[in-house]
């Protein structure tokens, strides 16, 4: 799972802010 799937509140978003 990643930012794109978990949303901006996801811990994965930290390194993939562009997914938001």
Swiss-Prot record:
It is found in: Secreted. Keywords: Amidation, Disulfide bond, Ion channel impairing toxin, Neurotoxin, Pyrrolidone carboxylic acid, Secreted, Toxin, Voltage-gated sodium channel impairing toxin. Coiled coil: none annotated. One of its GO terms (molecular function) is sodium channel regulator activity. The modification Pyrrolidone carboxylic acid is found at residue 1. Disulfide bonds join 3-13, 4-19, 8-20. One of its GO terms (cellular component) is extracellular region. The modification Cysteine amide is found at residue 20. The keyword Secreted applies. Expressed by the venom duct. Belongs to the conotoxin M superfamily. Mu-conotoxins block voltage-gated sodium channels (VGSC). Potently displaces (125)I-TIIIA from native rat brain Nav1.2/SCN2A (IC(50) is 5 nM) and muscle Nav1.4/SCN4A (IC(50) is 3 nM) VGSCs. Potently and irreversibly inhibits current through Xenopus oocyte-expressed Nav1.2/SCN2A and Nav1.4/SCN4A. The cysteine framework is III (CC-C-C-CC). This is Mu-conotoxin SIIIB.
